[in-house]
């Protein structure tokens, strides 16, 4: 049957998510999931009826949280669907181009390839910042520029001044898509305040990380109302299951927000524990991170990754040479990981 698929799909290498890679262990620090398993109440009523395309209570709750108007919010099945919607809505196949800056999240390229949209890569600088002159030189036919901050997998923040310069250089030419999946761990670095000034800005958000709802598959796109209305033309008619909307509203309630804030602080302490503990291991370099993960460079990254895997500690290998991404888990998971790595290098 594969021969019946589009040629681009036949040649496509799918994104290897943490779940697809698999593994077996008792310490799972490979998918940037939260270690907190929070409880929610839903009576599963009205399941015989379709949900609203954009549930009003859910949209209003996230608008209040993000500090925008409801008409500036679109919800989707995770931020990944937001990526696809932007590409489908704004890029002509075999004509338009997306631009992204590796090393970064892999789904920008795969989503574009799936829809027959060309990809341009402008690598980040040696300190993992935007190479603005090279981006400007490559803007021909580009409709979307994807920027991840905090960046996955490096963990760093992209300079705000550079984001503004990028928005300026792409005005009336392209949309800058800020992937803020991890911004809840450093909300002061958000670009949401720039929406009022730049109609070519779109922001991707998710409840998967700081809100500990990866299994809910609930994401948001923030933008000006005109851009949101374009996305509403291509989104599925019933993208949000009723229980998802109900749980999201609870997570965004005052009590839910207070809990998320506390858990973010707890993860920040565990991240600091990981950073200090691993930095004391000879030959190991820990890069500063602003999300719920750290990028760590080892003398032999692939070997360390495999040894941890065999020991039941599941980490995430990286396209960056000798680097491994380690999610921030609970304190016990962090302690086990640091102890294993210390013993490995003794």
Swiss-Prot record:
GO biological process, one term: L-histidine biosynthetic process
Subunit comment: Homodimer.
Cofactor(s) essential for the protein: pyridoxal 5'-phosphate
InterPro entries per record: Aminotrans_II_pyridoxalP_BS, Aminotransferase_I/II_large, HisP_aminotrans, PyrdxlP-dep_Trfase, PyrdxlP-dep_Trfase_major, PyrdxlP-dep_Trfase_small
UniProt GO MF annotations: histidinol-phosphate transaminase activity; pyridoxal phosphate binding
UniProt family annotation: Belongs to the class-II pyridoxal-phosphate-dependent aminotransferase family. Histidinol-phosphate aminotransferase subfamily.
Pfam family, one: Aminotran_1_2
Name used for this protein in its record: Histidinol-phosphate aminotransferase
Involved pathway(s): Amino-acid biosynthesis; L-histidine biosynthesis; L-histidine from 5-phospho-alpha-D-ribose 1-diphosphate: step 7/9
Entry EC number(s): 2.6.1.9
Reaction(s) catalysed (UniProt annotation): L-histidinol phosphate + 2-oxoglutarate = 3-(imidazol-4-yl)-2-oxopropyl phosphate + L-glutamate
HAMAP family documented for this protein: HisC_aminotrans_2
Residue positions, PTM N6-(pyridoxal phosphate)lysine: 209
Keywords, sorted A to Z: Amino-acid biosynthesis, Aminotransferase, Histidine biosynthesis, Pyridoxal phosphate, Transferase
């Amino acid at each position: 049957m594969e021969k019946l698929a589009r040629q681009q799909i036949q040649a496509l290498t799918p994104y290897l998510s943490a779940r697809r890679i698999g593994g077996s262990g008792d310490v799972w620090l490979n998918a940037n999931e939260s270690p907190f398993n929070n409880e929610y109440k839903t009576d599963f009523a009205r399941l015989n009826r379709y949900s609203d395309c954009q549930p009003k209570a859910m949209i209003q709750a996230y608008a209040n949280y993000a500090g925008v108007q409801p008409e500036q919010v679109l919800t989707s099945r995770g931020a990944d669907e937001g990526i696809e919607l932007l590409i489908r809505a704004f890029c002509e196949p075999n004509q338009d181009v997306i631009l992204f800056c590796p090393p970064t999240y892999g789904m920008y390229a795969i989503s574009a390839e799936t829809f027959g949209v060309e990809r341009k890569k402008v690598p980040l600088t040696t300190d993992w910042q935007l190479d603005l002159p090279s981006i400007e030189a490559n803007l021909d036919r580009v409709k979307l520029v994807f920027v991840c901050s905090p960046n996955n997998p490096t963990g760093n923040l992209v300079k705000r001044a550079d984001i503004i310069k990028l928005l300026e250089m792409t005005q009336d030419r392209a949309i800058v898509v800020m992937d803020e999946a991890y911004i809840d761990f450093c909300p002061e670095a958000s670009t949401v305040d720039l929406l009022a000034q730049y109609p070519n800005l779109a922001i991707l958000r998710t409840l998967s990380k700081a809100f500990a709802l990866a299994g809910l598959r609930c994401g948001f796109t923030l933008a000006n109302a005109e851009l949101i209305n374009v996305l509403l033309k291509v989104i599925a008619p019933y993208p949000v299951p009723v229980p998802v909307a109900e749980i999201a509203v609870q997570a965004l309630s005052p009590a839910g927000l207070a809990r998320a804030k506390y858990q973010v602080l707890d993860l920040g302490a565990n991240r600091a524990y990981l950073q200090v503990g691993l930095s004391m291991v000879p030959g190991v370099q820990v890069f500063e991170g602003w999300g719920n993960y750290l990028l760590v460079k080892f003398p032999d990254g692939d070997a360390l990754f495999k040894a941890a895997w065999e020991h039941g500690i599941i980490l995430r290998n990286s396209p960056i040479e000798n680097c491994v991404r380690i999610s921030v888990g609970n304190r016990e998971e962090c302690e086990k990981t640091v102890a294993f790595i210390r013993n490995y290098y003794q």
